[in-house]
Amino acid sequence: MAEPGEGLPEEVLALIFRHLSLRDRAAAARVCRAWAAAATCSAVWHDTKISCECELEGMLPPYLSACLDHIHNLRLEFEPSRKPSRRAAIELLMVLAGRAPGLRGLRLECRGEKPLFDAGRDVLEAVHAVCGAASQLRHLDLRRLSFTLDDALVLQAARSCPELHSLFLDNSTLVGSVGPGSVLELLEACPRLRALGLHLASLSHAILEALAAPDRAPFALLALRCACPEDARASPLPNEAWVALRRRHPGLAVELELEPALPAESVTRVLQPAVPVAALRLNLSGDTVGPVRFAAHHYAATLCALEVRAAASAELNAALEELAARCAALREVHCFCVVSHSVLDAFRAHCPRLRTYTLKLTREPHPWRPTLVA
């Protein structure tokens, strides 16, 4: 009698299995010899997402361990408040550090609540170990890692990962511990870096000058998060520095996320006219109307995405209508307050590239769902 997978080529099985969860891949490998061979081939594991919430606990040896060498890009999710999930994530990272030459991309995501006063030293030590071993690492995304990142991690990446193309450190922590000096060392050690995510306090005039250097490879994305007290006290960045950076990298896109910790005077320092802002997220405790109007006047040629969290008002409606009339390149706009019908009409009329929006005319139960444009 023929085995269940005998009639399907291994490459077809691999194409199917690569979309399965870790637990389902393990189950598929037990069906028959053909499926076992396909489930453990490199094509299945090249891009892998692993959740430590349930599927990894107790499963690392021997099945996953045998396939780690095939992983090039890993997205690892875990829940730091649950000890089994956290332990499984750390174990996987430490094993990966011992066999990491082939790793090209690592993305870590925390789920659930982080325990109070948890510095995450055990998790960060595992990340250090991976960075120290993965000399071919090209992409490191720590935006969803809910622990304070520091200079030591950046310097480890600078020393050990010269091939880095992207590094995102702009996570949701309320303490900024990455100084501009370590970022400068990173830029010098990683000449191919083309995407960088930072808290505002980690950026400096010298960094903008380094990015604008004539021998610098094309730089595509700078994501800046302004969410902690250090960001509010950051030194101002002159508009002339942004002019020079934009001239050196005409395709540069900047993403700005402004959180309640930023007072009005700091918002004014951040929103410089020459910044090529492609995405602007405003969640301010003070005036939001002024920044929206500023964006309408200075970012019309570059702004593709806008997110606003503020109290509803006639002034905000008027500012949004002005922005809609000026920013024809907008592809998405999300306002988490009730807006007038004229605001909705303005975005529909003036933004032909709009693909998704959250513009509610009446209060609805949360979460508010966006509308997709056909």
UniProtKB/Swiss-Prot annotation:
The gene is FBXL8. InterPro entries: F-box-like_dom_sf, F-box_dom, LRR_dom_sf. Keywords: Ubl conjugation pathway. This is F-box/LRR-repeat protein 8. Directly interacts with SKP1 and CUL1. One of its GO terms (cellular component) is cytosol. Substrate-recognition component of the SCF (SKP1-CUL1-F-box protein)-type E3 ubiquitin ligase complex. Residues 2-48 form the F-box domain. Gene3D superfamilies: 1.20.1280.50, Ribonuclease Inhibitor (3.80.10.10). SUPFAM superfamilies: F-box domain (SSF81383), RNI-like (SSF52047). Pfam families: F-box-like. PROSITE patterns: FBOX.
